[in-house]
């Protein structure tokens, strides 16, 4: 959810995330994937059995995690009634793509559902995305339903 125009959900794209991250001191290496209305962008190399260490979530997690940025802002709005119809649709599209990506990553790297977490759960990260209400009441149930099919 870095560097996205909050008021224009139809413009939530992974290329905006990449451009925003690329301009930072760490040169865009703070996440493995960006997901937006334009699809999934891979920002760091992935290898069989291992991933490139990234920066961003917190040192304890950076060495052992795959990080995904979802384009947009205020995903909790979808569940609190504050989202416009365009915002809801954008979140639904981005969520569906992210769920597909997470399932592939879970299968490839033997990641359990308990180890799929939001940035807001990382102590000291200072991040609130994608939003605890959204993640716990929408994303995780959708992910679990897809895994059980």
How does the language model describe each region?
Residues 24-27, 34-36, 52, 57-63, ...:
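Extracellular/periplasmic catalytic domains that process cell-envelope and extracellular macromolecules
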């Amino acid at each position: 959810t870095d560097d996205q125009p909050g008021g224009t959900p139809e413009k939530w794209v992974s290329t905006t995330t990449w451009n925003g991250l690329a301009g930072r001191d760490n040169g865009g290496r703070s996440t493995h994937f960006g997901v937006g209305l334009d699809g999934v962008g891979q920002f760091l190399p992935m290898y069989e059995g291992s991933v490139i260490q990234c920066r961003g979530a917190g040192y304890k997690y950076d060495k052992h995690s795959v990080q995904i940025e979802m384009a947009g802002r205020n995903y909790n709005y979808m569940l609190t009634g504050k989202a416009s119809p365009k915002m809801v649709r954008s979140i639904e599209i981005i969520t569906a793509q992210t769920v597909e990506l997470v399932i592939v990553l879970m299968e490839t790297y033997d990641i359990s559902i308990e180890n799929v977490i939001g940035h807001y759960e990382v102590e000291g990260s200072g991040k609130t995305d994608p939003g605890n209400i959204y993640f716990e009441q929408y994303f995780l149930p959708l992910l679990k339903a897809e895994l059980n099919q």
